[in-house]
From Swiss-Prot:
One of its GO terms (molecular function) is structural constituent of ribosome. InterPro entries: Ribosomal_uL3, Ribosomal_uL3_bac/org-type, Ribosomal_uL3_CS, Transl_B-barrel_sf. One of its GO terms (cellular component) is cytosolic large ribosomal subunit. This is Large ribosomal subunit protein uL3.
Length: 218
């Protein structure tokens, strides 16, 4: 496996804490229980049109797995897992079906991209959803302090443009935060300490991959 090869793993966001770096400065970190995952399928350009590995994470009661999924896991020779995801890469020769993928694959990697599902906030107003300043608190403003205000013209254009930022469902979106620094790797406990915040609530599923922008290595 080359140094610049894309690597990825599934994990669970445990929460945030803080640690000290080499210069005794406090660094806020997010703790991710990364893996262990298992390779359940290998996709190749010849048969599938692209190269990728399929990894599975999290134990699941075999009685709650449908027959197609049961057969898929049985073919791979692994017990049923709760989550399955694909990690695309140029070369899959370093992997084989049934192989375990642990957090130590990120040894030597400095920066990662983390994908997760953001917290759902339900129906939210424009001030909360988009950070609008709102309207004046006095001077004739009548029960419109948190309203959007004007959303377009009258006879022209005679409609509201697509993408106009207004009130609506907020959160519960799949979001990727890029170029986050790996502060520490605890291989024994399968823990990954990532500097800063990552998307999602505690206990949520996240995908951690080597950074695609700016270089994964310092």
């Amino acid at each position: 496996m080359s140094e610049n090869e894309i690597k990825g793993i599934l994990g669970t966001k445990l929460g945030m804490t803080q640690v000290f770096d080499e210069e005794n400065r406090v660094v806020p970190v997010t703790v991710v229980e990364a893996g262990p995952c298992v390779v359940t399928q290998i996709r190749t350009k010849e048969t599938d049109g692209y190269n990728a590995i399929q990894i599975a994470f999290g134990e699941k009661d075999p009685r709650k797995v449908n027959k197609p999924a049961t057969g898929h896991f049985k073919k791979a020779g692994v017990t049923p897992r709760r989550y399955v995801a694909e990690i695309r890469m140029d070369d899959t020769s370093a992997y084989e079906v049934g192989q375990e993928v642990k957090v130590d694959i990120f040894e030597g990697v400095s920066f990662v991209d983390v994908t997760g599902t953001t917290k759902g906030h339900g129906y939210a107003g424009a001030m909360k959803r988009h950070g609008f300043a709102g309207q004046g608190a006095a001077h004739g403003n009548q029960a419109a302090h948190r309203r959007v205000g004007g959303i377009g013209g009258a006879s022209f254009p005679g409609r509201v443009f697509k993408g106009k930022r207004m009130a609506g469902r907020m959160g519960q979106d799949r979001v990727t935060t890029q170029n986050l620094k790996i502060q520490k790797i605890d291989a024994e406990s399968n823990l990954l300490l990532i500097k800063g915040a990552i998307p999602g609530a505690r206990g949520g599923l996240v995908t951690v991959k080597t950074a695609v922008k700016g270089g994964a290595h310092a």
